[in-house]
Amino acid sequence: MPRSIAREQDVLKLPAPKRPPSRTSRRIGIHTSIAGGVENAAERAYRIGCSAFQIFSTSPRQWQPYELARPACDQMNALRQKYDLKPLVIHTNYLINMASINDHFLAKSTEAFRGEVERA
């Protein structure tokens, strides 16, 4: 198992915070991995004491998105509700350039951006 994924899995083994993140208007979070399922991102954020988190909804370095399973998304949303994790921020992939002067690249960027919005 790659080292970074092992670390991500280790976070899931952490005990729940002794004191849940405070429920204030000020939120602090991290960009967390969706490795092992999108629902794990919410669990990781909670376990380290965050009140918000950010994810890539698909690979940040590829045009071709992968589908997120509806049950996993529902589970993530249930965990967000349970742990009061909000907002969830979706980071678009690195390839998107909505200012491109290349028509082909702009079309791919537009399609990828729309996909990100739909997954959000």
List each language-model region with its residue ranges:
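N-terminal pre-domain/capping segments
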Residues: 1-92, 96, 100-118
